[in-house]
Amino acid sequence: MHARMTYTKLDPSSVDEARDFYNSEEVSGAMRQQQGYRFNYLLESVDTPGEAISMTAWDSREDAEAYEMSGAYEELVAKFVPFYTGAARLASYEVPE
């Protein structure tokens, strides 16, 4: 399994709206359509208001990279720009099974 984390800083006053949008069919539904998709979660910091991580899991690194290269990832990130207070950062991880 392969995991991808998108680290973000959200405007603390818009976290509820960002969470609702993240969990919407428009966002989470679009991810579910991708080959190799397993799950996605929005992790919200309990220590730093507005700090969040979008965690997605994929069957393989190739599936995660195909999702990113398809343009779907950039499209979804662009929809979150109104909520961001800084640039998003993407990182990838192997998950030993």
Task: Enumerate the predicted regions with their spans.
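Short, conserved catalytic or adaptor-binding loops enriched in Gly and charged residues
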Residues: 80-84
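Low-complexity, intrinsically disordered Gly/Pro/Thr-rich segments
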Residues: 74-79
